[in-house]
């Protein structure tokens, strides 16, 4: 069965996003503690398409670093080996990402979200980025902040030149979801499954 995978660090709102785009049709467990989803969770839509909620990579509350590395390896292996994935949705915390990326860069390391975004492109999963939690960004700072989000992912600002890839949304308030759903419709059509567009209706 064709799949769309959702990947992202722990606690960025992957499960909340699935609940929002399926209008609650998918039975989703949403938790505040990082690392609530610890193995792939499969949400079948009409027995035709599967949304796969991958475990969050990176920090997990109360979980040894060794286990966190195992989870990351599981995600990479899954994405490399599956041949039925249409594309990936890379969910990031738009509010927190620039600061987190800066911390990684200060340590001389590649930010984990940039690494994942590049990996998704390398394995041909044509990622679409859901920059979630924009309700936490002050309107006056929005443009500058989204430029920083783009930069954190390795995309040259201004962010608006990436409107087919980078979507500011709030799974909580619904802001930006119409544009995001329209992009999902376009992606499934492009993948050769126009009939799946009905799963991402805007009304």
Swiss-Prot record:
Annotated positions binding GTP: 8-15, 35-39, 53-56, 132-135, 169-171
Record key words, sorted: Cell cycle, Cell division, GTP-binding, Magnesium, Metal-binding, Nucleotide-binding, Septation
Disulfide pairings: none
Record Pfam families: MMR_HSR1 (PF01926)
CDD domains: YihA_EngB
InterPro entries: G_ENGB_dom, GTP-bd, GTP-bd_ribosome_bio_YsxC, P-loop_NTPase
Binding-site residues, Mg(2+): 15, 37
Protein function: Necessary for normal cell division and for the maintenance of normal septation.
UniProt family annotation: Belongs to the TRAFAC class TrmE-Era-EngA-EngB-Septin-like GTPase superfamily. EngB GTPase family.
Protein name per UniProt: Probable GTP-binding protein EngB
Source organism per UniProt: Methanopyrus kandleri (strain AV19 / DSM 6324 / JCM 9639 / NBRC 100938)
